[in-house]
């Protein structure tokens, strides 16, 4: 039989080729044995399309030989290998880690190549009795969340260390109103046990004992004024052994100036401090007035105007009194008489006057050592009294007198 050859083209490529040497016999189609003529049967069949055969040829596909099967298996393996090679590798992406105001911090994160199909295959291999439902959160996700929580805590702790409060002032919760909390700033008390010991030591002084025993009406030395004395000791900053009787009366006099307006009662402090010598009281008042002007910042600015005011006052006096010109010659004589009067005073009076000057100087230094802070809050007074509530001094309450 003549040899036939057919070629088919599809999409510009050769898709198959059929070459037959002879017409197949119906018996040869059923078995892959060799033909009786001794020539082997050769055929090449395309997998996608078969060409038409000659008339009288069976259109059923011939039996595939063992070599074709091996070729088909090899082709399937070769097709699977490029699929494995072309599997998408995990890519690296940039994700937003945190937002800081208008700045955005990016973090490089590797995209996981785990797909839901992998979870299904894993669940199918589990032993019976194990829940095959896919977990909602993987172990890697939990680790990521734990790391994220730790990073947030560390970021929150850093500003707290920077915004730490000063030791002198603290904020305490005063009251709670529903979801709102009212905060009140309270100054930490600087009173130490050493100041209480110095105060108790001065109470044993005989002059101070007589003074406290005399003040039965508690006009000058009630428990709040005495607590202010301890507060002034703490603010002055002197060593505990340095506080003497004069410091006690200075602090008590200053406390009366802040809380009381009774000038007559404060005069008794001078009586017990200087005993019967009252010649020093007017000078003490003068020094106290000068101290008040020295504490006022406006008074310090106006001190430069004092000579000008004196000059204008003298000019006004001369314009109203025509005899002032004649009396001007008597000024040196008046100064001479004043000096003689001072010399006629006894030595004790001159000594007391020098002591008063020293007292005023010490009082000024004592007030400056407190940084000019003479006001004491009621909370601080209560803390001072709570240090030793059984002390006999705290029983000096004016409410018990009525």
From Swiss-Prot:
Residues 76-89 have a biased composition (Acidic residues). InterPro entries: Speedy. Coiled coil: none annotated. Pfam families: Spy1. Signal peptide: none annotated. Residues 1-89 are annotated as: Disordered. Residues 16-39 have a biased composition (Polar residues). Belongs to the Speedy/Ringo family. This is Speedy protein E6. The lineage of its organism: Eukaryota, Metazoa, Chordata, Craniata, Vertebrata.
């Amino acid at each position: 039989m003549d040899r036939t050859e057919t070629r088919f083209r599809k999409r510009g490529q050769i898709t198959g080729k059929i070459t037959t040497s002879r017409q197949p016999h119906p018996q040869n189609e059923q078995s892959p044995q060799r033909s009786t003529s001794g020539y082997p049967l050769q055929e090449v069949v395309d997998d996608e399309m078969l060409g038409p055969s000659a008339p009288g040829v069976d259109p059923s596909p011939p039996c595939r030989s063992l070599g074709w099967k091996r070729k088909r298996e090899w082709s399937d393996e070769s097709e699977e290998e490029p699929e494995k090679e072309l599997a998408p590798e995990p890519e690296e992406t940039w994700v937003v880690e945190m937002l800081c105001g208008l700045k955005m911090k990016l973090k490089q994160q590797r995209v996981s190549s785990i797909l839901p199909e992998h979870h299904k295959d894993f669940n199918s291999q589990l032993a019976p009795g194990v829940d095959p439902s896919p977990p909602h959160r993987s172990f890697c996700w939990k680790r990521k969340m734990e790391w994220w929580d730790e990073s947030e805590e560390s970021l929150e702790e850093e500003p707290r260390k920077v915004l730490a409060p000063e030791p002198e002032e603290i904020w305490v919760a005063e009251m709670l109103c529903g979801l709102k909390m009212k905060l009140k700033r309270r100054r930490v008390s600087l009173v130490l046990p050493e100041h209480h010991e110095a105060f108790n030591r001065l109470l044993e002084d005989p002059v101070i004992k007589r003074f406290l025993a005399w003040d039965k009406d508690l006009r000058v030395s009630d428990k709040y004024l005495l607590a202010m004395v301890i507060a002034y000791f703490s603010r002055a900053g002197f060593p505990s052994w340095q506080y003497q009787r004069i410091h006690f009366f200075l602090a008590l006099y200053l406390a009366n100036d802040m809380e009381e307006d009774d000038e007559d009662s404060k005069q008794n402090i001078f009586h017990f401090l200087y005993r019967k010598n009252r010649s020093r009281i007017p000078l003490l008042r003068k020094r106290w007035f000068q101290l008040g002007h020295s504490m006022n910042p406006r008074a310090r600015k106006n001190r430069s105007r004092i000579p000008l005011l004196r000059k204008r006052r003298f000019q006004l006096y001369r314009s109203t009194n025509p005899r002032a010109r004649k009396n001007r010659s008597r000024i040196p004589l008046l100064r001479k008489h004043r000096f003689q009067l001072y010399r006629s005073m006894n030595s004790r009076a001159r000594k007391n006057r020098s002591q008063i000057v020293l007292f005023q100087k010490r009082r000024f230094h004592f007030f400056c050592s407190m940084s000019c802070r003479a006001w004491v809050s009621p909370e601080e007074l209560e803390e001072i009294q709570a240090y030793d509530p059984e002390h006999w001094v705290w029983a000096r309450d004016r409410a018990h007198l009525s």
